[in-house]
Amino acid sequence: MSKTHLTEQKFSDFALHPQVVEALEKKGFYNCTPIQALALPLTLAGRDVAGQAQTGTGKTMAFLTSTFHYLLSHPAIDDRKVNQPRALIMAPTRELAVQIHADAEPLAQATGLKLGLAYGGDGYDKQLKVLESGVDILIGTTGRLIDYAKQNHINLGAIQVVVLDEADRMYDLGFIKDIRWLFRRVPPAAQRLNMLFSATLSYRVRELAFEQMNNAEYVEVEPEQKTGHRIKEELFYPSNEEKMRLLQTLIEEEWPDRAIIFANTKHRCEDIWGHLAADGHRVGLLTGDVAQKKRLRILDEFTRGDLDILVATDVAARGLHIPAVTHVFNYDLPDDCEDYVHRIGRTGRAGASGHSISLACEEYALNLPAIESYIGHSIPVSKYNPEALMNDLPKPLRLTRSRPGNGPRRAGAPRNRRRSG
């Protein structure tokens, strides 16, 4: 991590459990990010925390560190059963739950606390087998958690820590009833440590904190601008007819090491994937229609660098931490202003720089004024020469439900294409 992303506060300065500090330092984490430096003094004192911080600033490690410390420092209830986890971490998406689990594994290995994972889509029996052996920390999405609870595979009566991650996204996805169902089955707020983290702390999120937490302390890390000063933003105004050719020309010019392209619909994403795959790019597709095993495989391949480009709907815009994303392309300007911030927040993370390129086409240009008002600044406009756009493009591939979601490997040097300034 860049030093500009960290504070002078060290994890070892806190009265954290020694095993937690050792695990953090083994992973190279010595200094706290701002949200960690604000939250840890409160959680270590047993205070509930509702935290807001910009995407990529260390929210996950803030609540994981607090959770592991609390469980190591407080005994479980005397009559705890094997199907009773001690901590519950709720996430809005399968991908985020899997990611939190991966981030927690080094801490689990160092401390001996057992992790469980519960998410819908697949793996029901495999997940259940782990739960039946007994877990200390259960991470999951609300639907699968409720499913296991209703069938008495898990009992939430011994919960000592509750974490709600990406709370605003929970509302957006309509999970608030599920959250309240789960909260009704854990011990009262005063008998547990509660943490809520979100990129935004809207009125409805604060209302949820008031309902379900014990006099939570609000901590906020607000950047000077919502989009982060390390992200270079750029905007083009293509016609609908030139939009795809402009995207492909920009990709050839930028030749990004690792890029995410966002579009507003799954059908648009499939179309983009088809054009890029036909042109020889190593590209993966991530939409709600992609099967769960394939989604995880595509994310893993993208994270490892086996794929250079990921085309995604906003299902991937929240919570995913994929290191070293150099470019984000907004093929469509999002209808929701917050989604613009979350999309481009995939790059410029953990002190790195990033580049966001947005295409304001005839269909979605009307979204731009609200986005610029929300982020508090105008997005710099760049021009292009229509005559310089790529025009020797192969016929796009068409996705069938049986074919893989990946394109061929990209090989060779980029075409010698340049846009005019």
Swiss-Prot record:
Protein location: Cytoplasm
Chain span(s) of sequence motif Q motif: 9-37
Highest rank taxon of the organism: Bacteria
Principal subcellular localization: cytoplasm
Reactions it catalyzes: ATP + H2O = ADP + phosphate + H(+)
Top enzyme category: hydrolase
Biased composition regions of type Low complexity, renumbered to the chain: 402-414
Residue ranges of every copy of the Helicase C-terminal domain listed in the record: 245-390
UniProt-listed Enzyme Commission number(s): 3.6.4.13
Motif DEAD box: where in chain: 165-168
GO MF annotation: an example: ATP binding
GO biological process, any: RNA catabolic process
Keywords: ATP-binding, Cytoplasm, Helicase, Hydrolase, Nucleotide-binding, RNA-binding
Domain Helicase ATP-binding: residue ranges: 40-219
Family of the protein in this entry: Belongs to the DEAD box helicase family. RhlB subfamily.
HAMAP family the record matches: DEAD_helicase_RhlB
Protein's job: DEAD-box RNA helicase involved in RNA degradation. Has RNA-dependent ATPase activity and unwinds double-stranded RNA.
Subunit-structure text: Component of the RNA degradosome, which is a multiprotein complex involved in RNA processing and mRNA degradation.
Name recorded for this polypeptide: ATP-dependent RNA helicase RhlB
Species, as recorded: Salmonella paratyphi A (strain AKU_12601)
Gene that this polypeptide is encoded by: rhlB
